[in-house]
């Protein structure tokens, strides 16, 4: 079994990474507390070979729980990797300004203050991560491609093409992107 723990700075692309892995047939769980990681893996062990978990580690207790869970999984012969997504502070601030959402650690201060607090809290986790990916210069599509490169065994999704014959009197297919009348 392969387990990827997706974590990192808020706004660096954790959700995007989770979506990419989910589209590549990984079993993905978002916002899982670190204490629930081990029970989850035991629950899905026979059903899924590839599991990705998005964990938000913003407290010391969560970091210690994650370290314990990771050690327990390695004892169970589970291949566990931590993917830490990072980005430059000014980029994170710009992303939060664009979405007009407050940073989770902002606490009434400036967005930059929240980013600084989070970077301080996640410093130890970044140091222990197996893969650190800087998303500063990446857009959503480039991040998806980069995740695909990092996890080379991802299926090549390529282009999906369906040809369908239909009659106009029955209506146009709802999921059609292009319709040719020949």
Please report, for each region that a protein language model flagged, where it lies by residue.
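The conserved Walker
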Residues: 10
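Conserved glycine(s) of the Walker
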Residues: 13
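Post-Walker A alpha-helix
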Residues: 17-18
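Conserved phosphate-donor/acceptor-positioning beta-strand/loop module used by diverse small-molecule
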Residues: 76-100, 133-134, 176-182
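Conserved nucleotide-sensing/catalytic segment adjacent to the nucleotide-binding pocket
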Residues: 24-73
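Switch/connector loops and helix/strand junctions flanking conserved nucleotide-binding motifs
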Residues: 61-63, 89-96, 104, 122, ...
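Hydrophobic anchor at the beta1->P-loop junction of P-loop NTPases
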Residues: 6
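C-terminal accessory "lid"/substrate-recognition subdomains
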Residues: 113-182
